[in-house]
Amino acid sequence: MAPHKHKRTLNIYFDTDYTIIGVDGSLRPGARKLFNNLIQSGDHIFIWSGNGIRWKDLDRHKLSHFVTECLEKPLANFQSATEGIPKNSKPDLVIDDNLEIVAALGGVWVNRYYFPNLEDNELDIVGEIIEEVKSKGISLNPRYRKTPIF
């Protein structure tokens, strides 16, 4: 039996610090390419941070035009904290260096990004996992956590 195609538009929530932006404010390699690919395939990018709304960082890196909305990220009680998000904007996948929020909401855990490193390919891996989830409904990559049903 052929695998069922799950291609659909996703709301993808990216953390900022240590996920797409380093300690020194540098942009993680592959961020612009990944954001462009996600937008081209119809997905919606949300940026959230436990350190407030981050439009200034997105503007500095010329990423604002990719982003649907910036939000304050909850730091605890992740499921109940996201209940106030409108249904059509709820996270389908969370991309974060904090495994706890990824496990609670579903998504992809990434290694922390601190300083410029041209060898860093974390966001290439994230892109591959997202494509796998979109086409198969799941990824077998150990960094992926299925969205819990609640």
Write out the residue ranges for each language-model feature.
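Alpha-helical substrate-recognition element adjacent to the catalytic core
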Residues: 2-80, 149
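C-terminal cap/substrate-recognition subdomain and adjoining C-terminal extension
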Residues: 56-150
